[in-house]
């Protein structure tokens, strides 16, 4: 799964064009990109047919009503060229929108073929014309990254249509549009409604965004209990930013019973996910022995992990400086430069 960008925005789904990174949501494609390859001889890459573009890739969800879908199964097994053949065949023969999206994903990422953003976009547009929410969302993300005001206005329309079609990622991004007030009028109450729609589908970033609105009383009545509940759910579905904030809430007893041990466990959970703030706070907990047994070497290791992500803490710098050379070496040995967290 591609890394999710922490904070207000989400990373585009696995096949989305790279220029739109700030406005999209995570998908479940594999992290490693296979080597680009030429298309099978049966498929002429980029050549349109009367039914639409000639190439396509698989969606990360199997088409409804097909159990199992051969193209999706091949995609999941890493047989990308086979998935492409099957998706293209079905898209051209039956006008199947899900197969079109799969084709677009493969072309956009270069799975099984050389990357072809133009052909990928053609497939997204063909699927969007059929009302496919994933295609509408991706096109919205592409347009939102444009400098053109007209394109951004169209992006809002695509997000809306995708959200109304059931895309939780689109609902989240539409909420951002109304929360920020840069593309559409700033309307926190409307933003909250779209975040709620995304949260109903357990979209992690929508849950977190809605929690912050309840925390601040922005567009909704201020409600620390509801904010904590939403943070808890966002944490459960993998949002490390929400887990970090939930840990702070639990440590302070805001909207939930104060529980330093639970807070320490939550900080550790987010720290292991690579969240620099959680790494810093967990280091402080270990250095003070509040909520977890005092462990200055572990505290130093977590501090160094956070510091590697440009999060400084003079107090913990002093802790590291106070260690013996042997202790510092032990702490440093637990932090590998390519790892998001100390190796325990």
Label each PLM-derived region with a short phrase.
Residues 27-94, 98-101, 105, 344:
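N-terminal leader/linker segments that initiate helical-solenoid repeat arrays
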């Amino acid at each position: 799964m591609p890394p999710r960008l922490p904070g207000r925005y989400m990373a585009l789904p696995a096949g989305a064009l790279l220029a739109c990174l700030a406005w999209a949501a995570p998908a479940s494609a594999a992290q490693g990109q296979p080597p680009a390859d030429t298309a099978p001889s049966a498929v002429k890459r980029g050549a349109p047919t009367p039914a639409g573009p000639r190439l396509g890739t698989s969606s990360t969800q199997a088409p409804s009503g097909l159990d199992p879908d051969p193209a999706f199964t091949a995609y999941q097994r890493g047989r990308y060229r086979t998935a492409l053949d099957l998706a293209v065949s079905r898209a051209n023969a039956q006008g199947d929108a899900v197969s079109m999206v799969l084709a677009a994903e493969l072309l956009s990422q270069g799975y099984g073929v050389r990357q072809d953003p133009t052909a990928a976009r053609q497939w997204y547009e063909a699927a969007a014309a059929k009302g496919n929410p994933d295609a509408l969302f991706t096109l919205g993300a592409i347009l939102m990254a444009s400098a053109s005001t007209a394109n951004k206005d169209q992006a809002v329309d695509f997000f809306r249509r995708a959200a109304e079609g059931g895309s939780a990622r689109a609902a989240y991004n539409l909420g951002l549009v109304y929360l920020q007030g840069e593309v559409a009028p700033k309307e926190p109450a409307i933003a909250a409604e779209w975040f709620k729609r995304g949260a109903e589908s357990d979209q992690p970033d929508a849950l977190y965004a809605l929690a912050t609105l309840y925390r601040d009383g922005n567009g909704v009545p201020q409600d620390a209990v509801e904010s904590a509940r939403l943070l808890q759910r966002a944490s459960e579905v993998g949002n490390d930013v929400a887990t970090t904030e939930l840990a702070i809430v639990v440590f302070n007893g805001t909207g939930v019973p104060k529980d330093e041990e639970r807070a320490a466990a939550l900080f550790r959970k987010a720290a292991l996910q690579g969240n620099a703030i959680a790494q810093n706070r967990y280091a402080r907990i270990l250095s003070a022995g509040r909520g977890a047994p005092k462990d200055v070497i572990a505290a130093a290791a977590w501090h160094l992990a956070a510091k590697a992500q440009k999060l400084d803490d003079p107090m913990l710098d002093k802790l590291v400086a106070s260690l013996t050379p042997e202790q510092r070496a032990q702490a440093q040995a637990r932090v590998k430069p390519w790892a998001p967290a100390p190796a325990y």
